[in-house]
């Protein structure tokens, strides 16, 4: 696919090949530092990466930023176990991505899938779901309090400008956000894309991390 065509496609999806969460926050970094303000990285953390409490499929309590994202390369997507739409396809794609990335997952990159229906998706339900897709170590399935999940969804940009569409949880399950937190590199791509494309996109931020 030509670069121009790919950019147009990603634009239609509301995505971009590689974008900081908020480029406008990075511009005044020198002035902010001189004034003793927050660093660009801290601004991104404060605005887009809330440190909400979550539970893994193993019942472990974790905090989103401190335990899952800080100093890491991650993939982030939303789903729910009883989804009959595209969730299974996206999850199956991510399982293939995990296989393609191999030993990088759990070492260089960490995969996080977050339930949009925490009232149903208990750790036990998530564990069964993870097993169904043969998820390996390095891929965590997460649930939490509904208000915390909603804050996380909105902060990460999984939203629709139409309020009615935004209420529809199925509108927020088709994309995958990935990023290198310490380098402030964040992007997104369609979860229905080819696993090879997804893996290549994620590998880009891994290579950036290794210089």
List the predicted regions and their residue ranges:
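A short beta-strand-turn-helix
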Residues: 53-73
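Conserved helix-turn-beta segment immediately C-terminal to the redox Cys motif
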Residues: 91-111
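C-terminal segment of N-terminal export signals and the immediately downstream linker at the start
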Residues: 23-55, 62, 104
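Thiol-based oxidoreductase modules, predominantly thioredoxin-like and allied folds used
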Residues: 108-121, 138-147
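Thiol-/selenol-based redox modules, centered on thioredoxin-like
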Residues: 166-211
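Short, internal strand/loop/helix patches
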Residues: 128-173
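Short active-site neighborhood of thiol/selenol oxidoreductases, capturing the structured segment around
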Residues: 68-86
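N-terminal secretory signal peptides and thylakoid transit peptides that target proteins
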Residues: 1-20
